[in-house]
Amino acid sequence: MGYDLHHGNAFQVLEEEYDENSIHAVVTDPPYGVVEFETANVEKMREEKGGVWRIPPELDGNKRKPLPRFTVLSDSDKEKLRNFFKTFGEAVERVLRPGGHVFVATTQLLMHEVSKQLDEAGLERRDVLVRETKTLRGGDRPKGAHERYDMVSSMPRVYWEPWLLYRKPLDGRLQDTLDTWQTGGLRRESEERPFTDLLEGGKTPKAETEIVKNAHPDPDDAEAHPNLKPQYLMRELCHAALPLQKGVILDPFMGSGSTIAAVHALGYNAIGIELDDTFFNMAENAIPNLAEVDTPVETRGDFAQQGDDSASLTDFS
């Protein structure tokens, strides 16, 4: 078991480094509106200058993290988003094995745009997973008029997060695809309970946020990744992604490494790609420590025996 990390453009890395039908699953939290994670806007977020990121007012004296606005996309921004996810869909469709699943975190406002591009790339939509989580996103009073319109919210407070679930078409029947490619299905939570589309995990624990914050390459500017996902959630998804507990999971937008850490903790193999210098360095530093976090996923009956059957990355090359 192990992981390979690449610093660069995900689409270029996949094209140059990975063959067709070589990846078993994709689990990723891509740039939500794409425009938020352009270099200039990430720098504004880090400097707390706002821009397309909203810098929330303090709440009971507590400083709140910057949040993507999501509602500021122009027609040209939307076209960029469509082109981005069209390229993403085509890239992962090429490297995925037949029957390989794709788990994609998205937002209520944009998931229809993302879904359409994945459809057109030849992937099959299987479900929308619902992550229950109370966030500080949405529910805000009008910008610059908090007191004047104190009983007005610009949009609902978001209490759930959608994850699109897609699959590359099977090679024959499901059992044929499992036999040939080790893909096509989802790992059950137990013999009695299948994987479900209602996800627990809730808010990212403070201990995990601190791990990532401390992994920042510049101690004077240390801050956790703005969309850090909890290990419980990511291990739940990564456990489901490999039905036979064998294979390689790809995260082409790994951020500070939560997916890669989850895969590593489960004893699977992973490939992570990240374009941003700071996030890549954070991932390198944070992954080993995030992988040491305990979650309920490791208590499942099939977890202990999995280590005996684990393979290395080279077995799938």
Question: What spans do the regions from the language model cover?
Answer:
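Extreme N-terminal starter segment of soluble prokaryotic enzymes
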Residues: G2-D4
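Class I S-adenosyl-L-methionine
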Residues: E16-T28, Y32-R82, E93, F103-V104, ...
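Conserved SAM/SAH-binding loop
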Residues: G8-Q12, F303
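Glycine-centered, small-residue-biased loops immediately flanking beta-strands
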Residues: G100
